[in-house]
């Protein structure tokens, strides 16, 4: 009897997200807690409905190459960037394959790039590795005084259009909070092929150490107050953005 109750409860929790069938709506978001197949298997065993793998950051790849190249020649930097990119991408593709080998729930790859060509190439390789969907972790602070209003939003749309021309799996866009009105952008993302939108990305917060007067990182972990802004715009989007 208890088994039947559990089965019926789980059945009622079944849902879909970005075209993926989920046994429940509990999705483990991208972090260091999803950076290995062993950890991801534990999430599935604990009852998660899907897993978003730790993001692959193009910026981190280039920064690592520059650090390795410190004090050497410019042409060596180009070589190291190429090597580091291929190495990190291969590691990530192996993470996808290894996780898919031990998990039956949907596995969503996550990428963060700043060049359009890299978004597309990474997405193609992740689909081939077996990812069930791709989350575009678009996280950027616009601080250019010559910024043209609307350019940032158009960049989001262009990225989705280019990637959807190359892959068949669902593409999900994770937006940052630095948007005046996310609703028109969400509408255009869906119109150009996005299967889902996540609100919002949590950026690293800055802080100042009053004892040393030095600049540093603020709180790393989030809190329940981070939900309020997301809940507001999720509610508005669910009503006003055409399905």
Q: Predicted regions span which residues?
A:
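Alpha/beta enzyme core
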Residues: 37-58, 63, 70, 93-97, ...
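N-terminal amphipathic alpha-helix/helix-capping segment at the start of soluble metabolic enzymes
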Residues: 6-27, 92-100
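Active-site gating loops and adjacent loop-to-helix segments of metal-dependent hydrolytic enzymes
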Residues: 67-83
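Short, flexible loop segments at the rims of nucleotide/cofactor-binding pockets, characterized by
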Residues: 27-31, 84-86, 175-176, 223-225
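Short coil/turn segments at secondary-structure boundaries
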Residues: 79-90, 110-114
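Short, basic, glycine/proline-bearing loop/turn elements
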Residues: 20-27, 79-82, 170-171
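N-terminal phosphate-binding or glycine-rich loops at protein starts, especially the Walker A/P-loop
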Residues: 21-46
């Amino acid at each position: 009897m208890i088994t039947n109750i559990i089965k019926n409860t789980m059945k009622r929790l079944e849902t879909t997200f970005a075209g993926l069938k989920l046994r429940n709506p509990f999705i483990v978001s991208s972090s260091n807690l999803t950076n290995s197949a062993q950890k991801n298997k534990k999430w599935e065993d604990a009852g998660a409905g899907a897993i978003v793998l730790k993001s692959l950051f193009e910026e981190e790849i280039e920064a690592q190459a520059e650090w390795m190249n410190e004090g050497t020649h410019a042409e060596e930097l180009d070589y190291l960037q190429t090597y580091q990119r291929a190495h990190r991408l291969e590691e990530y593709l192996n993470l996808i394959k290894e996780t898919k080998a031990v998990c039956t729930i949907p596995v969503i790859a996550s990428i963060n790039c700043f060049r359009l060509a890299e978004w597309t190439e990474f997405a193609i390789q992740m689909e081939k590795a077996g990812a069930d969907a791709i989350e575009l972790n678009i996280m950027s602070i616009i601080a250019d005084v010559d910024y043209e209003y609307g350019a940032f939003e158009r960049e989001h749309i262009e990225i989705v259009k280019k990637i959807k021309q190359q892959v068949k799996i669902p593409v999900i866009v994770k937006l940052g909070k630095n948007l005046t009105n996310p609703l028109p952008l969400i509408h255009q993302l869906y119109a150009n092929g996005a299967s889902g939108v996540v609100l919002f990305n949590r950026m690293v917060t800055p802080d100042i150490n009053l004892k040393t007067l030095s600049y540093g990182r603020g709180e790393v972990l989030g809190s329940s107050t981070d939900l309020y802004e997301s809940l507001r715009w999720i509610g508005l989007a669910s009503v006003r953005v055409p399905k």
